[in-house]
Amino acid sequence: MRVTLSGDARGSVYYTLDGSMPTPSNTKKYTGAFYVPGGTVIRAVSVVKWNGIRSDETSMTVTARGNLFADVKPGDWFYNDVDRIAAEGILNGTAKNVFSPNVGLTRAMLATALYRAAGQPEVSGELEFSDASAVGSWCRDALLWACENGIMRGYEDGALRPGRSISRAELGCMMTRYLVLSGKDISELEDVLSGFSDAGAVNESMRTELNAACALGIVKGVGGGRLDPNGGATRAQTAVMISRMLDKL
């Protein structure tokens, strides 16, 4: 991947490619664009010599698939899956060079990711929910597709709540619905959900679909025998689960 660096025009930028701290005395001075292989961690600092001002260090990882993130590094448990899902344009970063792996996501964001994974098929019609007028144009087609295909459902009061945060249980259920839409048979999967100590916290209407996601290895526990079904799903968890789901197709 071709990399360019920038800093204070009055000074110089120094960088390393081995993960060590860059300093003016023993590391490379940036003179122009350079190429690095995937998996390289670039650490850079800008130094203005005449007054000794030194910028905060910047650290970026060039992933194996050519993504450039400051908060996704080799060794992170989600590294390969985030790299894959971002490279395929399914779940993009939240800002330039930022993925925000520990941030949650909304129902609209998840619908958009799954819609992209499906190839963004053409849709027609209107969202028939009490809060449909509040749906932004950026996610309208994705939500329409998700609702028409039974992947996302509204609430008993007639609202869709696209801005509501996704729980781990909801995420697992939607992964299962996506697989069923793609032709996956989930009728004879073993019961693994009951093996989690907090399985009783799962809404009865979600148990079959969430169990399928667990039995297929899409949703896994968080440690200590717990599933944390009602905990908020993070962007990293979502990328990992989508990647696992796609492997089942």
List each model region and its residues.
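Short, compositionally stereotyped local motifs that mark structural "simplifiers"
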Residues: 1-66
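C-terminal/domain-terminus segments
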Residues: 234-241
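Extracellular/luminal Pro/Thr/Ser-rich low-complexity repeat and linker "mucin-like" segments
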Residues: 1-10, 77-88
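Short, small-residue-rich loop/turn micro-motifs
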Residues: 9, 17-19, 114, 118, ...
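Charged, amphipathic alpha-helical interaction segments
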Residues: 45-51, 151, 218, 243
